[in-house]
Amino acid sequence: MYAASREASSRSREALRAALTGSDSVAATTGSELFAVVAVLDDQRSLRVALADVSVPGSARAELSERVFGGKVSVATQAVLTTAVAQNWSRTSDMVDTLVLLGQEALLESAANAGRLDAVEDELFRLGRIIADNADLEQALSDRAKPAAAKRELIARLLAGKAEPVTISLAEQVVGRNTTRIGAAFDELSDLAAARRDQIVAHVRAAIALTSQQRERLAASLQRIYGKPVTVHVQVDPSLLSGLVVRIGDDVIDGSAVGRLERLRRELA
């Protein structure tokens, strides 16, 4: 994002914080309604452009949003939306992406208030791995030719009775926006949930499954390095031969046999 959109995003997030009261029901409603608003904006380009048109005063854009969505969403959601559309965004897509992020944060807030954030984070990670490991499922969920409603219905059917309501809502939103980065989108959501708990996420690829003791030791070691609690998400990858690869943000620690062989190859070249 450029500076204008970063400032607009910050002010919109402040509006979200002010709108949420600590009640998981208010947060859940706000998150779901923001997703519904985004669905409308995705479908109606003219409205999307009008609400982000910087040549029109912010107050007029706010009035337009109230005419379109007033009475159809809660007071909290309307307050967030009014603030967001009144800002000057560098790009229309920045406004829509921020509304998506605010919806995600509101739903994660509701999970935190209900004491279910840990479960949601774990489910999002595991769902991302399941999709990444199933080419047919990934294709079905990322197929731009398939209607968004059909993809939302598919993921809801797969998760029914197996996942937290917040996880299902977040998953439906991800697959409904025609992204081709399904696995990465779920990783980002899992990271967002961890950040909500003031933790960082270590994405670990290991040649074999780690025991609970090994995971705990790894998390403790990484916490000493990064100075914050670390959530360890492990994906088994036999192609590494032995050892593991740890990714935290842009940092990569490669302790795998394949990595060591590659470094040796470069040294000998």
Curated annotation (Swiss-Prot):
F-type ATPases have 2 components, F(1) - the catalytic core - and F(0) - the membrane proton channel. F(1) has five subunits: alpha(3), beta(3), gamma(1), delta(1), epsilon(1). F(0) has three main subunits: a(1), b(2) and c(10-14). The alpha and beta chains form an alternating ring which encloses part of the gamma chain. F(1) is attached to F(0) by a central stalk formed by the gamma and epsilon chains, while a peripheral stalk is formed by the delta and b chains. The keyword Glycoprotein does not apply. It comes from the Bacteria. This is ATP synthase subunit delta. F(1)F(0) ATP synthase produces ATP from ADP in the presence of a proton or sodium gradient. F-type ATPases consist of two structural domains, F(1) containing the extramembraneous catalytic core and F(0) containing the membrane proton channel, linked together by a central stalk and a peripheral stalk. During catalysis, ATP synthesis in the catalytic domain of F(1) is coupled via a rotary mechanism of the central stalk subunits to proton translocation. It is found in: Cell membrane. Belongs to the ATPase delta chain family. It holds the Pfam family OSCP. It is a peripheral membrane protein. PROSITE patterns: ATPASE_DELTA. One of its GO terms (cellular component) is plasma membrane. It comes from Nocardia farcinica (strain IFM 10152). Keywords: ATP synthesis, Cell membrane, CF(1), Hydrogen ion transport, Ion transport, Membrane, Transport.
